[in-house]
């Protein structure tokens, strides 16, 4: 078929696709409560609200502001390096976490542990003891940030996999959309709360870190309690698949050592531009 013929047929194919799309839209949609109640769905979505508060207040705004404040005298580079290190750790361990998430009979225990660790180290940001210098306070908090952000990112992998617990292929997109929408509410809640305690009440930035930890935990609790998993009886087959996956990842990394070099260069460039 000539190129001119393809151009002439394009409007016809577009109309056919549009017709198929409209016919698909007319079909009755599967209710979002097919697999779980609306209460369970919003309990799941509230976790998204909580972790968005962490993302906005800690990763995007207040921790970086605290690092460069006169209180500790850090630089943008200090925060950039810490963020790069935490993301590098996520990048290197994501295949293992993903394999574990895919093959584990229950995801919620892993989500619970990663969330608690993130919350604990978030609450410790800005921690200081009598006699500590500014550089010591900064270094300790940067280490805590690396750990908190790592477990936040790891928790996202397990959280996303729990969507299958409350959804079906027919309503997964809409339920996921509810989580995203509730997450945007979390951004607003976090910013307004932080502004209130810093600008109105006059608390220092570390109070925002503790507030973030508390809000994250509070909004995560409904997900842990009311989202019920139904684990199957395939423990040993899943364990075998998991081990085979991990061995396959290890073999691939050994054979493709270029990945390590690429990762090193990538994060070196990131650190340079962050400084």
Stretches found by the model and what they are:
Residues 174-195:
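Glycine-rich segments within core transmembrane alpha-helices of 12-TM secondary carriers
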Residues 115-134:
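C-terminal ends and interior cores of transmembrane alpha-helices
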Residues 81-99:
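Central cavity-lining transmembrane alpha-helices of secondary-active solute carriers
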Residues 29-87:
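Helix-loop boundary and gating motifs at the non-cytosolic
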Residues 121, 134-155:
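Hydrophobic core of transmembrane alpha-helices in multi-pass small-molecule transporters
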Residues 101-116:
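Cytoplasmic membrane-interface "Motif A"-like loop-to-helix N-cap segments
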Residues 194, 214-232:
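C-terminal membrane-cytosol helix-exit motif in multi-pass small-molecule transporters
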Residues 150-181:
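Cytoplasmic helix-loop-helix junction between adjacent transmembrane helices
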